[in-house]
Amino acid sequence: ENGKKHSQYLRDGELEPLREQIEQRKVLQAQLKELQAKMPKVRQPKLDFETSVIVGKGLAAMSQGVKGWGLRDCFGQLEDYLYSNESDRVCLVFGLRRTGKTTMLRQAIARMSKEDLSRTAYIKARRSDTMAMMNRDLKKLFDAGFRYVFIDEVTLMRDFIDSAALFSDVFAAMGMKIILSGTDSLGFWLAMDQELYDRAKPIHTTFIPYREYSRLLGIDSIDEYIRYGGTLRAGELAFDDEDVNAQDASFRDDESTRRYIDTAICKNIQHSLACYEAGGHFRHLYSLYEAGELTSAI
């Protein structure tokens, strides 16, 4: 002890009782070990969620597919937020379709330690979800010890823009790390201007420089970069198969280009305006929106 050796001598007649006590202790330890092995394992009670929540083994399986994929240049900002000490703020990952948003979330989950992964949940928001449902599920997750929550396509919820402060002012303030992702950039900007003012760390994924595109996909052709509009969908395909690539390219012809613009840009703008303060910001565009002609006008 403390670098010193201590010795103790036994008196005559004390050795045998001590040996008996040692043997008795060994027997009791063996019995304790046997009883502990027979005890049923305590399982965490199954949580009943209203939204689409993935935890545990499902979460680990979901992140397996992205291991070994290249990281976006902005990925470091996401991990900086996850492991920082700041509270009261959420992280927003937004941008056009096929720019790596969901992949970034899966990569962040895949790189977590086992301890952090056990406290992580992934939620895929749906149009039928509401902020009230999300609030109840987040309370259950917090009470169960979860501290990292990734919510994908959060802007699909119609009341997100007008109620987004729930994430920052309540759950982030309680110590949870909330990552919100979606394609509706206007919806996020409206939320940051009101509900999430000075309460959000934005990460914009839309712009992908050619150098980053080439690094991620291993392609040195500027023609391919232009062909896919600087998006990353090609990274999920086999470039040796020209037919598959031609069919899937977002900008392979006028029709595919128009469809991408209509769904990824025009309809997102309309969705944001419709959800923000009960559609009160359409103004003179409302007649076009009601007539279904606003997409063409945009």
Per-range role (PLM):
Residues 188-298:
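Interdomain motor-coupling "hinge/lid" segment immediately C-terminal to the ATP-binding subdomain
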Residues 37, 43-87:
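A short, basic N-terminal segment
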Residues 170-192:
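Sensor-1/coupling segment of RecA-like P-loop NTPase cores
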Residues 142-164:
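Conserved P-loop NTPase "ATPase switch" module shared by AAA+ and STAND
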Residues 104, 108:
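Hydrophobic positions on the alpha1 helix immediately C-terminal to the Walker A/P-loop
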Residues 101:
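Conserved lysine of the Walker
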